[in-house]
């Protein structure tokens, strides 16, 4: 199968063996890159009667429904740390260049515990939002993501990412590239502290 020949081995990073849940996750990733839509529209796009590409057939997802996609996202959330650790072990090492940035997105509805009013990049008045930080390797390939409450300042997200890279990923000496709004003098002091271990 073509998916199994992807150079980075994303299929194996997500789950070692072929399974429906792995195919659902891969299908959502590929569909999001090719033609981003809602989960309902994505499921319909996989369906044998409405598919606009062969993705549903290749991954055997022609009968997938929206609920299955949400279940796959819950499954993926439980695997997030393991997947991030694997990506970090493959693509980060001492001396690596790490790209870090923060953005936000507004929310519809009011069921998200992390949804708060904060600096709104989307210019959507009266909407709660979430903030998320993304760690990427030197080529811009994502390694890890963390979601924060919507009223979290960009600068306050950075220290936890330094800790994540140093402690969880075991990468002590790196070059961080981020924007000026994140790299404050107090964050710089934390960066230049001697690393234990």
What function would you assign to each model-found segment?
Residues 1-99, 103-116, 126, 135-146, ...:
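Dynamic "connector" segments at or just before major functional cores
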Residues 124-130:
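Short, flexible loop/turn motifs enriched in small residues
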Residues 128, 135, 174-176:
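Short, flexible coil/turn micro-motifs enriched in small/turn-prone residues
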Residues 153-197:
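An internal, acidic/charged active-site-proximal segment
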């Amino acid at each position: 199968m073509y998916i199994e020949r992807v150079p980075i081995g994303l299929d194996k990073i997500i789950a070692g063996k072929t399974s429906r849940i792995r195919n659902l996750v891969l299908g959502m990733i590929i569909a999001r890159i090719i033609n981003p839509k809602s989960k309902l529209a994505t499921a319909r796009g996989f369906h044998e009667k409405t598919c606009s590409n062969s993705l549903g057939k290749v991954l055997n997802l022609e009968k997938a429904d929206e609920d299955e996609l949400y279940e796959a996202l819950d499954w993926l959330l439980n695997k997030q740390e393991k997947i991030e650790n694997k990506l970090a072990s493959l693509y980060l090492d001492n001396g690596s260049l790490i790209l870090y940035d923060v953005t936000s997105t507004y929310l519809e509805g009011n069921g998200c515990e992390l949804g708060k009013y904060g600096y709104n990049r989307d210019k959507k008045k009266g909407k709660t939002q979430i903030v998320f930080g993304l760690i990427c390797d030197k080529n811009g390939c994502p390694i890890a993501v963390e979601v924060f409450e919507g009223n979290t300042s960009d600068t306050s997200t950075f220290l936890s990412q330094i800790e994540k890279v140093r402690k969880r990923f075991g990468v002590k000496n790196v070059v961080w590239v981020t924007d000026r709004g994140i790299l404050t003098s107090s964050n710089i002091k934390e960066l230049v502290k001697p690393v234990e271990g």
